[in-house]
Regions:
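N-terminal interaction modules that seed assembly of large macromolecular complexes
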Residues: 2-56
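Low-complexity intrinsically disordered segments
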Residues: 41-130
């Protein structure tokens, strides 16, 4: 599973975490969050390092944020930043099959189509078993 999918799926789980669900599903959510804590920390740290490495700087070497406080990049560095971020996002992360979900387990919850697409790497589709 790709690192970006893990990070995105964690965000979805966190939005569902306050809903009352069957114990088995809540337990699986909790185990998955716990298992992927280091992955999310690695992603956030690495992303920050990429931004810091290529960000525009003033003459004293300090990062020059834009008016919204976000990182800015010189035009000639944007492709490199995008490439580095893509490489980070596509880093493979192993998720045990036992922590993947069946459609039936997730049916009691409400998901947007976008959330289902993000979460799909963690779903054991019945069609996969045929």
């Amino acid at each position: 599973m790709k690192l970006i999918d893990v990070v995105s799926a964690r965000k979805i789980i966190e939005t569902k975490a306050t809903e009352k669900v069957e114990f088995n599903l809540a337990y699986k959510f909790a185990k998955l969050i716990k298992l992927t804590n280091d992955d999310e920390e690695f992603y956030n740290k690495s992303q920050r390092e990429i931004f810091e490495q290529y960000a525009k700087r003033d003459d004293k070497g300090n990062v020059l944020p834009d008016e919204n406080g976000r990182y800015q990049f010189d035009t000639d560095k944007i492709a490199t930043v995008e490439s580095e971020l893509r490489k980070l996002a596509t880093t493979e992360v192993a998720i045990p099959e036992s922590l993947k979900f069946t459609v039936e387990e997730l049916t009691p919850l409400k998901f947007s189509v976008e959330e289902v697409m993000i979460f799909s790497s963690l779903i054991k589709d019945n069609d996969d078993e045929k």
